């Protein structure tokens, strides 16, 4: 009865260190960890202890006897990561454990290490967690929205509630007595980098990649065009996108790009609104989706099936919940790739693609069509989008799709931060292992650090940020221990005074807990995990009704 890792795996790696027989791979010290689509349990080596189940922050692990029907393909996926062995073979238990990355040890100085973290998504919260393992370290997290947790709150599809459970880990971090939230505070607007550094030994930026990579073709930008990430933010009640004018009065939507976000959008646009009503989806978005006329979403990729950007777990999940089809031409492309590709993961994707329904078969369900070798040329329409024209990649042929909504899903892009260097081409802050590097001098900027997507680019999954943040924290601690970080010039109590003077509507940890509790209470009456606020004013009103946070002295 081995345990199985399923679709919602976040690559956090906590399960690896909980396993007493080192049967979960790749481990964080192995080369494939940073790029692996998920982690895998060796069914032959697993001793059925279940330690990994409680360690997983997103509930992605279950016994093979307790899997839902849609999770059964993950039995083979886990097993196929390992060499083929006789079915009755059982490896003897081993005492070898995955090597744990030791926490950086902070040396005692006159002033305890105090770090400002800008951003509150996974990279930020993993960094805070790592810092707070050391006695005496203080962490202040600054976030421009009144609510924390970045893309976990506003970028994960609402029907992926298991994955959103990682916020329970972040909540525990935020409850630490040496942790403070300064929410609804924008660095670069309310406070500068230098002002943060005057109150902290170090400033760690974990702001993600908030912009979209843009597709520069004629017609993008007219009504009826947008980006998949904007649509996901709209669906998730992000206050900046809560009332996006999304027109779903036409029968077809085209999504350009075929990564996981593209699949999320396609799945949500074709989902039964009654099912979405049991999630934390935005009320406004749910109303619009309830009146949708969309019958088909075309997910168009420039390259062939073997180069599909989506992950295998997401493809399997999509097939289990949605009507996914291929036309005859794309099916031939799948067959051609399968004959030439040797990589086992890619071959598994191609196997799943080859099993999809033929698009010529009639269906009463809304459907998702995966299309390949289509290079976008222009959006059709004058006053608003009426379709999109593609060239068939590598040929002189053109292909058109009528569509009332055209979305691009070609990736995220980091954004310049005032007072810090920025690599425009890579869209990251130049750094060496997390230390921000001034390109003009070729040396690190004292006290400035980065983690997450703004450090390495928009790659990996939620848990990938954990190892990335640990590396940066080790750099912070090493520099502090070496005496390279200047003690704050301001007294600790002055920080809160300065923040509230600049932004009277600052939301602290107590205010966030009040917002969180109110959303959960509103949702519980409707059988939902929460009903999110969409207006900042409503969030601030709830937070203002919370008792003030009693500040603790640094010690």
Curated annotation (Swiss-Prot):
Residues involved in NADP(+) binding: 213, 258-261, 302-303, 314, 460
Residues that coordinate or bind [4Fe-4S] cluster 1: 9, 15, 19
Keywords (A to Z) from UniProt: 4Fe-4S, Electron transport, FAD, Flavoprotein, Iron, Iron-sulfur, Metal-binding, NADP, Oxidoreductase, Repeat, Transport
Catalysed reactions, semicolon-separated: 2 reduced [2Fe-2S]-[ferredoxin] + NADP(+) + H(+) = 2 oxidized [2Fe-2S]-[ferredoxin] + NADPH
Coiled-coil ranges per UniProt: none
Catalytic class of the enzyme: oxidoreductase
The protein's name in its UniProt record: Probable ferredoxin/ferredoxin--NADP reductase
């Amino acid at each position: 009865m081995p345990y199985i890792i399923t679709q919602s795996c976040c690559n956090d790696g906590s399960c690896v260190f909980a396993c007493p027989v080192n049967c979960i791979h790749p481990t964080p010290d192995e080369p494939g960890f940073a790029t692996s689509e998920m982690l895998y349990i060796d069914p032959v080596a697993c001793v059925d202890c279940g330690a990994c189940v409680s360690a997983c922050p997103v509930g992605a692990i279950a016994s093979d006897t307790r899997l839902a029907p849609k999770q059964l393909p993950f039995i083979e996926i886990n097993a196929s990561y390992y060499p083929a062995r006789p079915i009755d073979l059982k490896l003897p238990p081993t005492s070898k454990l995955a090597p744990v990355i030791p926490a950086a040890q902070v040396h005692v100085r006159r002033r305890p290490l105090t770090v400002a973290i800008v951003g509150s998504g996974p990279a930020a919260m993993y960094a805070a967690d790592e810092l707070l393992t050391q006695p005496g370290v203080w962490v202040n997290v600054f976030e421009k929205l009144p609510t924390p947790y970045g893309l976990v709150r506003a970028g994960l599809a609402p029907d992926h509630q298991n994955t959103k459970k990682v916020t329970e880990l972040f909540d525990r971090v935020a409850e630490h007595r040496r942790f403070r939230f300064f929410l609804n505070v924008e660095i670069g607007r309310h406070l500068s980098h230098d002002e943060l550094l005057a109150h902290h030994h170090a400033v760690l930026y974990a702001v993600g990649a908030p912009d979209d990579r843009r597709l520069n073709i004629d017609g993008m930008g007219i009504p009826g065009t947008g980006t998949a990430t904007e649509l996901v933010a709209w669906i998730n009640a992000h206050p900046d996108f809560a009332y996006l004018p999304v027109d779903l009065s036409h029968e077809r939507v085209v999504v350009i790009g075929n990564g996981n976000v593209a699949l999320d959008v396609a799945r949500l646009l074709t989902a039964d609104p009654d099912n979405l009503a049991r999630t934390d989806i935005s009320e406004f978005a749910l109303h619009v989706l309830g009146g949708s006329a969309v019958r088909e979403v075309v997910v168009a990729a420039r390259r062939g099936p073997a180069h599909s950007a989506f992950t295998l777990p997401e493809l399997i999940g999509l097939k289990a919940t949605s009507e996914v089809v291929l036309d005859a031409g794309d099916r031939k492309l799948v067959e051609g790739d399968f004959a030439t590709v040797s990589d086992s993961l890619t071959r598994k994707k191609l196997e799943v693609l080859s099993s999809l329904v033929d698009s010529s078969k009639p269906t009463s369900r809304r459907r998702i069509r995966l299309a390949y070798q289509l290079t976008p040329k222009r959006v059709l329409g004058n006053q608003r989008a009426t379709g999109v024209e593609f060239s068939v990649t590598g040929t002189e042929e053109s292909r058109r799709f009528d569509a009332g909504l055209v979305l691009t899903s070609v990736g995220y892009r980091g954004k310049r931060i005032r007072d810090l260097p920025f690599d425009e081409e890579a869209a990251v802050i130049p750094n060496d292992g997390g230390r921000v590097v001034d390109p003009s001098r070729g040396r690190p900027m004292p006290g400035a650090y980065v983690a997450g997507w703004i450090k390495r680019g928009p790659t990996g999954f939620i848990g990938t940020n954990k190892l990335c943040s640990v590396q940066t924290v080790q750099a912070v601690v090493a520099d502090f221990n070496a005496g390279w970080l200047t003690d704050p010039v301001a007294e600790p109590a002055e920080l809160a005074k300065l923040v509230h003077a600049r932004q009277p509507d600052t939301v602290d940890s107590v205010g966030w807990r009040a917002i969180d509790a109110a959303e959960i209470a509103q949702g519980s009456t409707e059988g939902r995990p929460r009903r999110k606020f969409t207006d900042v004013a409503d969030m601030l009103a709830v937070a203002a009704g919370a008792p003030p946070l009693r500040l603790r002295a640094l010690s």
